[in-house]
Amino acid sequence: MYRTLFNLVKRKIPKISDTELIALRSGNTSIDRDILTGKINYPEKITYQNKFPKDNLSTLLTQYDHTPVYPNSNNNKWINFLGKNKYFSFLIDEQYGGIKLSTNELSNILTKITSVDPGLGVVTMVPNSLGPGELLIHYGSEEQKNKYLPGLADGSYIPCFGLTGPNNGSDATGSIDKGLVMEKDGKKVIKVSLNKRYITLAPVANLMGIAFELQDPDNLIGKEGVTVALVERSHPNLIQNTHHIPLNAGFPNGTIKGEIYIDLDQVIGGEKNIGNGWKMLMECLSAGRGVSLPATANASSKVASFGMYNYIKVRDQFKMPIGNM
């Protein structure tokens, strides 16, 4: 019976694609593996030493005037404050001007900021999650690291990452933008047709990471597949003038469009990483999926709990606070 059911389900479920197989083989396991196998090795207690100045965070939280970060004609005020005060550098090593934090400290800071304003939390979260910074740290060439990481650390560069499009989102590689290897002016370049949307920080970013499916029909370089490259805002034919503001969500979000030509050395890590983009993305999702997003959820839970706790003390029914019932 079970074999029959198994074969029935097997016929209905699509086969694992190459990109899904790469995702399954990427990265490693954490304590979840130990829990599922029943062999948990408790590590010794870790003492965290906080690196980020408390007065810096206090200044942000006390001076923030609760006007939306976006849409706001004065949105640069707080974005510039975050950049200049190292809030975009929490993944970057000190040698590049960053303040690399422990997971614990990063989570605590994001939780506190998001509890004041979710939009401000998102603006802080994105540069410290999957994007140009983390991809450069793990896969960038030394030349790329020296060029971009100091600017990301001090806020000169505001990053965003363009993966999502009209027909791909959770299914990240479904109908993804295409790139074509070709020769132009005597050298090999990549022609990329961009149609990205729902890209957080896109309207204000000046350094974009873009993902696309590279095709090489003439076998000019002998490599194809999902590829990740860097593009600056000033790049010819790049368009970032459309904004998404659903429900006045409070953080910059928009599109990245245009038909552009990029050099092979704009691929993160250089030509050797052409076609490795999907693996790179899967191995760098942990900061956002495992730290940043849970921190924002933690903030929402704490704010809701705080509000409910205070409400039940002042809301009376049957001549007593409802919290005493």
Annotate each PLM feature:
Residues T255-R289, F306-N324:
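A glycine-rich, basic-preceded beta-loop-alpha segment at the flavin cofactor/substrate interface
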Residues P236-Y261:
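Flexible, small-/acidic-enriched active-site or ligand-binding loops
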Residues Y64-V69, S89-Q95, I113-P118, S129-E134, ...:
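Glycine- and acidic
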Residues N167-S170, Y198-P203, H244-N253:
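Short Gly/Pro-enriched turn/cap motifs at secondary-structure boundaries
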Residues K188-L238:
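A short core secondary-structure module
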Residues M1-P127, E134-S156, S170, G186:
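Amphipathic, small/basic residue-rich leader segments at the start of a protein or domain
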Residues A23-R25, I99-S102, S170-A172, S193, ...:
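Short helix/loop capping segments that flank catalytic or ligand/cofactor-binding pockets
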Residues C160-L180:
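A gly/ser-rich beta-alpha-beta helix-loop segment of oxidoreductase catalytic cores
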